[in-house]
A protein has these predicted regions:
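Carboxylate-rich, polar loop motifs that coordinate divalent cations or form catalytic acidic clusters
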Residues: 1-179
């Protein structure tokens, strides 16, 4: 944190002895939500919710119980939807949804049923609020489209020799295209 008055930075690091602090010092993504608080996705520490005004951390770690926590402690991408809920991309645990009103998680795992994410290693997320769609880039599973209203997934994969498909099944970033 930067202090404009002193010109100094204050570091926040993890401390195993401190239960209220950051769970891991390696932060892979940061999202500032519509309330001005920060959601920090960490490497093997899950998600940390940080209120900078009061310097309070809330930890969301991996859990064996779907409603209580993340499917994986490795969080690489996080986005907020128009309802203030979080969509969390994990490495190895697919896509996680956190409902801020009920404070419960829902996991979207690869291969779990017919309508699922194509791969568990999520590398990119993009939210289209007008269409209520989440675009999900994966490592080796191509591109996924999740219609939030219906819960339906569509998979877009590379097909060898077909130039009309993705050039690769590795999608690391997603940006909107404007005509």
């Amino acid at each position: 944190r930067y202090n404009k008055t002193t010109g100094l930075f204050q570091n926040h690091t993890s401390n195993d002895m401190q239960n209220e602090g950051l769970t891991h010092s390696s932060i892979w993504c940061i999202v500032k939500d519509n309330q001005g608080t920060l959601w920090l996705g960490t490497y093997f520490g899950g998600v940390n919710y940080f209120n900078p005004e009061y310097e309070i951390y809330t930890r969301y770690k991996a859990s064996r119980n779907e409603k209580e926590g993340l499917s994986s402690p490795v969080v690489g991408r996080t986005i907020e939807d128009k309802n203030g809920n979080l969509w969390i991309g994990t490495e190895g645990g697919g896509l996680n949804f956190y409902n801020r009103r009920t404070r419960e998680f829902k996991w979207y795992l690869a291969g779990k049923g017919y309508n699922s994410i194509s791969h568990s290693n999520v590398k990119a997320l993009y939210y289209d609020p007008a269409k209520e769609i989440i675009w999900i880039g994966t490592h080796l599973g191509g591109l996924n489209k999740l219609d939030i209203r219906t819960g339906a997934f569509t998979h877009y994969l590379m097909e060898e020799g077909n130039p009309e498909t993705l050039p690769s099944n590795i999608v690391r970033d997603i940006a909107p295209y404007h005509d």
